[in-house]
Amino acid sequence: MPRVKKAVKSRERRKKILKLAKGYRGGRGKLIRSASETVDRALKFAYRDRKTRKRQFRSLWIMRINAAAREHDLSYSRFMHALKKANIDMDRKALAHLAVNDPAAFAKLARIAKEAA
């Protein structure tokens, strides 16, 4: 069998890890073992938090819609139910954007929701 030299692949693998560890302090950015552990942990957190971010934004949108709806004497759940009855199909992101940036348009939606309820 021919002799296999893995220097190129090993160097590529280590360079890839050190590139991901760029900016880390001390040995975590220079030493391959420390960098590898830290990068693995960072990637695990990044994966987990990409999922968490979706939940957090949905929660934020609901809070904003609820606050704006309560200014018009509606709770969040009654507001959303009334919008569904009025056949207004807007997602929470758009409703939250209206609540923050265009209160007049949100007031119209609240009025429609009150009529539908």
Swiss-Prot record:
GO molecular function (one): rRNA binding
One Pfam short name: Ribosomal_L20
Gene3D superfamilies: 6.10.160.10, Ribosomal protein L20 (1.10.1900.20)
Taxonomy, superkingdom: Bacteria
Keywords annotated in UniProt: Ribonucleoprotein, Ribosomal protein, RNA-binding, rRNA-binding
A Gene Ontology term for the protein's cellular component: ribosome
GO biological process assignments: ribosomal large subunit assembly; translation
UniProt cross-references to InterPro entries, sorted A to Z: Ribosomal_bL20, RIBOSOMAL_L20_CS, Ribosomal_protein_bL20_C
Job description of the protein: Binds directly to 23S ribosomal RNA and is necessary for the in vitro assembly process of the 50S ribosomal subunit. It is not involved in the protein synthesizing functions of that subunit.
Classification via PANTHER family: 39S RIBOSOMAL PROTEIN L20
Family: Belongs to the bacterial ribosomal protein bL20 family.
Protein's recorded name: Large ribosomal subunit protein bL20
Species in which this protein is naturally found: Syntrophobacter fumaroxidans (strain DSM 10017 / MPOB)
Name of encoding gene: rplT
